[in-house]
Amino acid sequence: MTEKKNEPLWSENVIVVDADYADRVAFDLIVNFERMLGRRIPAADLARWIDCLALDGGMKPGDDTSVAVVLVHDKSSNGFDNFLPASYRELDGKAFKDHLGEFVFSSVPVEHLTTKDDLLIDVVQAAMESEEVKRLMVIPNSEDGDCYDRLRQMLRRADDRKRITLFAMQPMPGGNFRQEILGYSLMQALGISAAELDGKL
């Protein structure tokens, strides 16, 4: 990864992640698939996962555009346990470039005066209101609390020209956005193929 410390937060494409939630889901998948497949599952490849999210969000190879990846996380958490690279501090301001474009990471810890859900919603709202942002992909904690429902209500006001995708582990109530299943991109990042699952499910 390369250093991109002075890059602005927003790009034409933005991915906002509840990083602690994504890490927990990855852990659950690792435990379940290790038992099912009878082999060790390594930590998820973070760059591959981000690529899969971008594709699920409608980006195409050859777009050659910039993507802001915002990792919202608890202040007490230093990094992912189930992704590599893992350190939030080391990821902050770093970038990687591939066939989809350049992905620039920002790590945003939750301060004491707010909650992670509130912070994530504030980040999504700011991206939604930015003229620069054309495509927005959001991975909220859709299992605990009301973050998903609050996002759903807020996105009713979203500009129809913006392409917005929410990711969850199962189909959720719809709204002014597209939905994608989070597990598919995580399975790719964990190196679990459809062929390997044939006959196991």
What residues fall within each predicted segment?
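Domain-level signal for Mg2+-assisted phosphodiester chemistry and nucleotide/NA-binding surfaces
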Residues: T2-V108
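Nuclease catalytic cores that cleave nucleic-acid phosphodiester bonds
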Residues: D98-L201
